[in-house]
């Protein structure tokens, strides 16, 4: 077997005819592996950059959503107060109109006051402000809704509301002002 014969077969173990071919093939293989590794690295770097960009966009979107939510809450508070104040304007108008009348009789004043009170109660009701008005003799004292001014001897059972000195008010199950009451003393 001569190395110069082109028809000569390669040795089966290595498949190379010479050491130079083997070194060249290994160099090509290493070069190919390096090229593949560099291509994989470039692909991973591109994917990493894409994910970093997606993260930054998602973070910016979350920040914007948080800012919008804070703005909406601020506006809702402002407009809630605005709507409540607007519902009280007719009451103020009625009071001012009543004060303008110079020769009003007691009956006129009472009638105007009752009409104004109805307007005020309607405005409170529209804004979900409900009265806390316990029924004397039947309502049990509730420290969450009532404030006991005194404990008095009574024919009622202990801890029953005897009199209501001032109604209380609540909004959305939150007490704005407790009802001022007297409570029956234990017997």
From Swiss-Prot:
Keyword check for Lipid metabolism: no
TM annotation in the entry: none
UniProt xrefs under Gene3D superfamilies: 3.90.20.20, Head domain of nucleotide exchange factor GrpE (2.30.22.10)
Molecular function (Gene Ontology), one example: protein-folding chaperone binding
Xref: Pfam families: GrpE
InterPro entries: GrpE, GrpE_coiled_coil, GrpE_head
Domain of life per record: Bacteria
Cystine bridges: none
Localization per record: Cytoplasm
Keywords: Chaperone, Cytoplasm, Stress response
Gene Ontology cellular-component terms listed: cytosol
Family: Belongs to the GrpE family.
Name recorded for this polypeptide: Protein GrpE
Gene that produces this protein: grpE
């Amino acid at each position: 077997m001569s190395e110069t014969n082109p028809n000569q077969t390669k040795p089966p173990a290595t498949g190379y005819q010479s050491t130079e071919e083997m070194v060249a093939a290994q160099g090509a293989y290493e070069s190919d592996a390096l090229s593949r590794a560099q291509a994989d690295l470039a692909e991973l770097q591109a994917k990493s950059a894409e994910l970093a960009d997606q993260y930054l966009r998602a973070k910016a979107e979350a920040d914007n959503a948080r800012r919008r939510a804070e703005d909406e809450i601020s506006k809702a508070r402002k407009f809630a107060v605005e709507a409540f104040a607007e519902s009280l304007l007719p009451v103020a108008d009625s009071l001012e109109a009543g004060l303008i009348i110079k020769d009003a009789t007691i009956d006129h004043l009472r009638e105007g006051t009752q009409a104004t009170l109805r307007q005020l109660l309607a405005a409170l009701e529209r804004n979900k402000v409900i009265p806390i008005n316990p029924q004397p003799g039947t309502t049990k004292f509730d420290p969450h809704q009532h404030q006991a001014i005194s404990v008095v001897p009574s024919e009622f059972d202990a801890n029953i509301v005897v009199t209501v000195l001032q109604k209380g008010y609540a909004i959305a199950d939150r007490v704005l002002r407790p009802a001022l009451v007297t409570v029956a003393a234990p017997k």
